[in-house]
Amino acid sequence: MHNQAPIQRRKSKRIYVGNVPIGDGAPIAVQSMTNTRTTDVAATVSQIKALERVGADIVRVSVPTMDAAEAFKLIKQQVNVPLVADIHFDYRIALKVAEYGVDCLRINPGNIGNEERIRTVVDCARDKNIPIRIGVNAGSLEKDLQEKYGEPTPQALLESAMRHVDHLDRLNFDQFKVSVKASDVFLAVESYRLLAKQIDQPLHLGITEAGGARSGAVKSAIGLGLLLSEGIGDTLRVSLAADPVEEIKVGFDILKSLRIRARGINFIACPTCSRQEFDVIGTVNALEQRLEDIITPMDVSIIGCVVNGPGEALVSTLGVTGGNKKSGLYEDGVRKDRLDNDDMIDQLEARIRAKASMLDEARRIDVQQLEAK
């Protein structure tokens, strides 16, 4: 029931990664990267399908060898989500996966080779209508820039990016997006700010090597949140030393928190105190797990007492306010029923699923009516 975020998106060109639009006001795409051995086709396909189930728009796959390129061919045949091939050092691998239907090529200008090799990759991408991501990383800047700046700086990352943007411009190729990633939040944020002023290509956001599940999520939320709140960013990846599925979940949580893109349930829950009338923490944890399959955007407030419960319920799709033995259930801000505290989880799950089905049906009818006009 909350309004959309009052954020003015940066204007950018439109490209497509497979069937996913990027830039020019398109929904911000959430992506992750496999961490399996790409040559283990079964494991990689299984992980990609798990990422698809939690809403991944795009998945990146590392292709370090020609054997991995051959495996990529088999992987591509078994999944539906667009795949980005991550290429380092050997430009010939990019040419090979292009033959196998890759949806996007990610190259690192710091290690892909000389201009002639880049030209060869670009010509191939143009012929096959494959977009490119220029991926600049603070950890792999070109040697001359390392010597010039002494250490990674926003200006160094910008210069690296612009060097290769200019190269693609000279080759008359505009189907690309750019990233300037760093593990330091301030370095990454300032680099993206500078880059956003220089080009109108889509920007892929990320805090690289952010850390483990908890610390990495925090760093990514701060860094990406700052940029997104300024309207910067067209795709994102939350980089975690964790199950890639968590990257997608955190990515959507960041977008939901900024009211930029909604997917699934946005739970609003109190941290609890001695006033709670039912087990709020247990209820929220259980429902988050049980309702992962719900993709309908909904705000669900679960508050343990009457101090803040009614107020949160007023602006929630569904809201629970703790009471003695029974708790008040609100729907669209109106009190509808009372739920037994001892059976809260099962009752609330049923109500949420019913509401999601109702909202889905209403949206389906709206779409049909629009199409009929």
Curated annotation (Swiss-Prot):
GO molecular function: 4 iron, 4 sulfur cluster binding; 4-hydroxy-3-methylbut-2-en-1-yl diphosphate synthase activity (ferredoxin); 4-hydroxy-3-methylbut-2-enyl-diphosphate synthase activity (flavodoxin); iron ion binding
Cofactor(s) it depends on: [4Fe-4S] cluster
Gene3D superfamilies according to UniProt: Dihydropteroate synthase-like (3.20.20.20), Sulfite Reductase Hemoprotein, domain 1 (3.30.413.10)
SUPFAM superfamilies: Dihydropteroate synthetase-like, Nitrite and sulphite reductase 4Fe-4S domain-like
EC number: 1.17.7.3
CC cofactor note: Binds 1 [4Fe-4S] cluster.
Known role: Converts 2C-methyl-D-erythritol 2,4-cyclodiphosphate (ME-2,4cPP) into 1-hydroxy-2-methyl-2-(E)-butenyl 4-diphosphate.
The protein's name: 4-hydroxy-3-methylbut-2-en-1-yl diphosphate synthase (flavodoxin)
